[in-house]
Amino acid sequence: MSEPRARRFFQQIISGIEYSHRLKIVHRDLKPENVLLDDDLNVKIADFGLSNEISDGDFLTTSCGSPNYAAPEVIRGGIYAGPEIDVWSSGVILYVMLCGRLPFEDDDVQILFSKISRECQLLLFAVCLADAFTGRGQLPHSIVPLT
């Protein structure tokens, strides 16, 4: 997919996620199959079956979602605020749109997540989770505009 088209779709995905996070809802299963396009090629996020309501200061612990798109802390069964896992999944979707393949693949979930370096996890954590554990539960504004 071309970068301009991927940028347009990604902007709309992030906008939809930010909107749901403002409503205190985290999707938890973002993947291309749950990103639909209408007749005008506008993104519609679908399948909120694994979504959860989030509260400031509370954490989620359920391991859910599609392993190839789920954040490492979800697969490990760790705690998470919520919005950061949608950001991770969005990043994987962007990678797939631009490269045509997943960044990490394996049939075994443990091997899959061992392929994601600790440094990569920490970088994504630092960039995407700046406010997640302070109770704000919103995407950092620095990643929204992609112009």
Task: Locate the predicted segments by residue.
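Eukaryotic serine/threonine protein kinase catalytic domain
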Residues: 1-147
